[in-house]
């Protein structure tokens, strides 16, 4: 891992896209068939107001450290780094959730995590998103890439 994306300057707007390779075909009778490849990744596009050279320098230097597409890094957009819900406390996974699961039993929270919130488990590099509001059972996408 090549570090974390600079937190300053802050982007004016951010677009997050989920990329999930899917094969889709049509039969001769026009029935649609779809198959998932099982992978997923996020792409993020950030737009900045015009910056001076000094303001842009941390972003430029970080981009160069990545050596094109070689580097891997983390990025927490300020607007998305906290839940949009009322959850407080420490999320504890009850365990026994396997790769491929998309429903995760947990406890330790008071309040609610909201659909669209992002979550990362301590033992994972992968970031997941909640597909519904949650208090004790998290519905996530993509499904777990490895056990938690």
Model-found features: residue ranges?
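Extracellular/virion structural assembly segments
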Residues: 1-148
């Amino acid at each position: 891992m090549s570090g974390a994306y600079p937190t300053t300057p802050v982007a004016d707007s951010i677009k997050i896209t989920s990329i999930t390779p899917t094969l889709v075909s049509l039969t001769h009778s026009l029935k649609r068939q779809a198959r998932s490849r099982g992978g997923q990744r996020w792409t993020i596009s950030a737009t900045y107001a015009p910056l001076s050279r000094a303001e842009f320098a941390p972003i430029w230097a970080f981009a160069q450290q990545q050596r094109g597409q070689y580097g891997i890094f983390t990025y927490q957009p300020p607007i998305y780094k906290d839940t949009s819900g009322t959850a407080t406390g420490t999320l504890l996974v009850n365990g026994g959730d396997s790769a491929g699961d998309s429903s995760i039993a947990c406890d330790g929270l008071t309040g609610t995590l909201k659909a669209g919130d992002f979550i990362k488990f301590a033992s994972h590099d992968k970031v997941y998103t909640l597909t519904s509001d949650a208090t004790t059972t998290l519905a996530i996408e993509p499904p777990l890439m490895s056990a938690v």
